[in-house]
Amino acid sequence: MYPSNKKKKVWREEKERLLKMTLEERRKEYLRDYIPLNSILSWKEEMKGKGQNDEENTQETSQVKKSLTEKVSLYRGDITLLEVDAIVNAANASLLGGGGVDGCIHRAAGPCLLAECRNLNGCDTGHAKITCGYDLPAKYVIHTVGPIARGHINGSHKEDLANCYKSSLKLVKENNIRSVAFPCISTGIYGFPNEPAAVIALNTIKEWLAKNHHEVDRIIFCVFLEVDFKIYKKKMNEFFSVDDNNEEEEDVEMKEDSDENGPEEKQSVEEMEEQSQDADGVNTVTVPGPASEEAVEDCKDEDFAKDENITKGGEVTDHSVRDQDHPDGQENDSTKNEIKIETESQSSYMETEELSSNQEDAVIVEQPEVIPLTEDQEEKEGEKAPGEDTPRMPGKSEGSSDLENTPGPDAGAQDEAKEQRNGTK
C-alpha cells in the first residue's frame, strides 16, 4: 500500500527533519498538488464578493475593526490538499486509521504517520493528540475521537463533540499553530446528525475565537459532501455575520473609553476639591492673625499719641462722629486727660482683644486717616478755645454712655490750661 522506501525510514528522524524545514524546502518534496492558504477566502471576503457594493464594503471595513469573519473560512474539497499549519483528523480510538476522512489522511501522509500513531497508544473520546504531517502539505495532524451517536444524540454526545473541538484548539494554541482546518467530526459512520454537529462546531469555535482571536490567523471548516456545505453555509450566516464584531475587541474599546474618561473625572474631582479648599480659605481669612494684631497695636499707639476716639466693648464707633470730634480732642490735650484716656484705652483694648479671640469673624476696626493741622488751623483753634466754656471730652461718641457720665477735670486745671494757651498765643 505504501512505497517500500518509506517503510524503512524511522518516523522520529523524519519528523525532526521535516519540522526543521522551511515552507519552500517542504514544497520541493510534495508528492501531490496543494492549495495554499492565501487562495482560500475568509468568510468576510466571500460575503463581500456576493453582490455587495464597494461603498458598503468600505463602510463595513471602517466600522468593523476586528471581525471574527476574517478568522474563519468555508471550504468544500479534499482536506489532505490544504497547505496549512495543521489539519484535524476525525479518528477512531486506536488512531491507526480507518474509513472516511481518517483513511484518506493516513494514505496521503504515508507510513510514518501510522508509525507515530502506534506510539501514542490510542485516544479517548473527546480528547485529541498531535503528530507530524509527513507527506501532507500540512505541517501537523491533530487526531481527535468523536462520539458514536448512530443517529440518536443526547447531552453526553453533544458534550463529547464540543470537547473534540476544544481539545483540538488547545493543541493549536500550545503548538503555535496559526492556521487549522476542521472536517465534519462524527457525521460519517459514527452517525451524528449533520445539522446539530455543525451548530456545535460553529458555536464552540466562535466562543474560543472571541477569547483567543489573536492566537490564530484562520480556522477553516472543510466539508466534502453537498449536504454539509449547504448546512454550514446557512449556519455561518447566523454565527458569523459580516457585521459581527469581535466581542473581546468591544470589551477593549469599552476599557479604553473608560480610561479616556478617567482623567477627566479625576480632573473634575480635583477641581471640586480645590473649590472646597478655596471656600475654606475664604472662611478662615476672617480669623485674626498676627498681622491684624499688629494693626490693632498700631492703632493703639496712634490713640495714645493723638487722642483719637476709642471703641469700647467691641462696638464700632461711628466714623462720622469720630471725624467731627477728632480736632476738638486734639485741642484739649492735657496731662491729666492723657493719663485718664490712656488707662481707659488700655482697658478698652483688652476687652476688644478678648472679644475678637472668641468671635469667628473678627471685626477689624478701620481708623480714619489723620490729617495733621497746619499752623493757620492751630491758630484758629487756639482763638476758638478761650470762648468755649467746657472742653469736649476726647473719644466721646453717641453710643458711649460711660464717657458722657465721666466727670471732667477740676476748674483749676481748666484755668491753668487756658492761661497756658493765651500765653502761647
From Swiss-Prot:
Domain Macro: 59-240
Presence of keyword RNA-binding: no
Pfam families: Macro
Crosslink feature (Glycyl lysine isopeptide (Lys-Gly) (interchain with G-Cter in ubiquitin)) location: 170
Catalyzed reactions per annotation: 2''-O-acetyl-ADP-D-ribose + H2O = ADP-D-ribose + acetate + H(+); 4-O-(ADP-D-ribosyl)-L-aspartyl-[protein] + H2O = L-aspartyl-[protein] + ADP-D-ribose + H(+); 5-O-(ADP-D-ribosyl)-L-glutamyl-[protein] + H2O = L-glutamyl-[protein] + ADP-D-ribose + H(+); alpha-NAD(+) + H2O = ADP-D-ribose + nicotinamide + H(+)
Annotated control of activity: Subject to product inhibition by ADP-ribose.
Keywords: DNA damage, Hydrolase, Isopeptide bond, Nucleus, Ubl conjugation
First-listed, main subcellular location of the protein, grouped into a coarse class: nucleus
Biased composition (Basic and acidic residues): 302-343, 381-391, 415-425
Listed result of changing residue 188 to E: Abolishes interaction with ADP-ribosylated proteins. Strongly reduced ADP-ribosyl hydrolase activity
SUPFAM superfamilies xrefs: Macro domain-like (SSF52949)
Effect of residue 102 to A: Reduced ADP-ribosyl hydrolase activity. Reduced ADP-ribosyl hydrolase activity
Localization per Swiss-Prot or TrEMBL: Nucleus
Lineage top rank: taxon: Eukaryota
Region (Disordered): 243-425
Amino acid composition bias (Polar residues), ranges on this chain: 344-360
EC number(s) from the headed UniProt entry: 3.5.1.-, 3.2.2.-
GO CC terms in record: nucleolus; nucleoplasm; nucleus
GO biological-process terms attached to the record: brain development; DNA damage response; peptidyl-glutamate ADP-deribosylation; protein de-ADP-ribosylation; purine nucleoside metabolic process; response to bacterium
Family affiliation: Belongs to the MacroD-type family. MacroD1/2-like subfamily.
Subunit-level organization: Interacts with ADP-ribosylated PARP1.
Protein name: ADP-ribose glycohydrolase MACROD2
Organism: Homo sapiens
Lineage of the organism: Eukaryota, Metazoa, Chordata, Craniata, Vertebrata
